[in-house]
Amino acid sequence: MASQLTDAFARKFYYLRLSITDVCNFRCTYCLPDGYKPSGVTNKGFLTVDEIRRVTRAFASLGTEKVRLTGGEPSLRRDFTDIIAAVRENDAIRQIAVTTNGYRLERDVANWRDAGLTGINVSVDSLDARQFHAITGQDKFNQVMAGIDAAFEAGFEKVKVNTVLMRDVNHHQLDTFLNWIQHRPIQLRFIELMETGEGIELFRKHHISGQVLRNELLRRGWIHQLRQRSDGPAQVFCHPDYAGEIGLIMPYEKDFCATCNRLRVSSIGKLHLCLFGEGGVNLRDLLEDDTQQQALEARISAALREKKQTHFLHQNNTGITQNLSYIGG
């Protein structure tokens, strides 16, 4: 195996977020309020199963232990189960997760688990069906809830739920969410609304710091847990009276980037060193053939020398990210 991916600031990278499409069938207000609009990439332009097999093999060789499949909505790909199986071929990758809007969970989650999926994140921004419809543009709340139940029935011991925290939308609904997870092994993750190129006005109107929730959780006796090396950026809290957990993702907090352990590859094969960075490093020309793996690993390793110490969100610099469907949030 090649040496562990490490950047100039001694951060080690165990976690790959791999976007497999930027297409989504939801119209979430904070991401794609006007719906998906193709950006010159046809469905045939997204990474193929063989290309995904090659890129994840290279990352596995470079020490990656966890791969998260993102989008867009990953399950819109008809070959999604084959993609999971292709990633599963790498013994070094211990965790394969997906972030999904959940609309196909009930139908397909058992097949995904059989193919090798080990973790699920479902986006649920409200537990009120009408508000869910207003946020997502889809009247599928009950379908998504049934999908979460189906995930437990398929054998997943825990389901993570992502909730984008928005002032005057859901920030005051903590008790409703806590009641929901009291007897369910759900890790509910509140994600601070992040500014993107297309979402400046929404950010100014609805952003609220996750510190407000953290202070309230600590006041109620919730306990901050230690992170594992392949965990994502959430600060996780538990409570003896709850089966579920609470996670807080606060990208505007001081030193948020100090524990960065993840890299991103877009659905068209570009390596992105930061969600809010510029440009990206093209990998696709080295995904054509199995004989290119050594060169692929070398390019990935070399690119890390350019990773910045921190994002520049505090300076309102959102980089290339116009919306979160582009490289998977």
Swiss-Prot record:
Pathway annotation from the record: Cofactor biosynthesis; molybdopterin biosynthesis
UniProt-listed Enzyme Commission number(s): 4.1.99.22
UniProt cross-references to InterPro entries, sorted A to Z: Aldolase_TIM (IPR013785), Elp3/MiaA/NifB-like_rSAM (IPR006638), MoaA (IPR013483), MoaA_NifB_PqqE_Fe-S-bd_CS (IPR000385), MoaA_twitch (IPR010505), MoCo_biosynth_MoaA/MoaC (IPR050105), rSAM (IPR007197)
SUPFAM superfamilies given in the database record: Radical SAM enzymes
PROSITE patterns, sorted: MOAA_NIFB_PQQE, RADICAL_SAM
Domain Radical SAM core: 8-234
Classification via NCBIfam families: moaA
Protein name: GTP 3',8-cyclase
